[in-house]
Amino acid sequence: MKRVALQSSSLRSLGYDPEQQILEVEFSSGALYRYEAVPPEVVQALLEADSLGRHFNQVFKPQHYRYWRID
């Protein structure tokens, strides 16, 4: 999955497969996680957020998306 670099102190890059609704997030630590069943509008809102890290923590943690570390 192709990932794009982000301007964030906590998130380094992300990639998204809209057909499978899979989001890959690389954190600034280098850890890489895959989240499933993430709707496109949720990814778009993340990309448009003023603070990517804050938005990620406020949306993804409470929603309990299924995820796993892949690196």
UniProtKB/Swiss-Prot annotation:
Pfam families: KTSC (PF13619). It comes from the Bacteria. InterPro entries: KTSC_dom. This is Uncharacterized protein PST_2887. It comes from Stutzerimonas stutzeri (strain A1501) (Pseudomonas stutzeri).
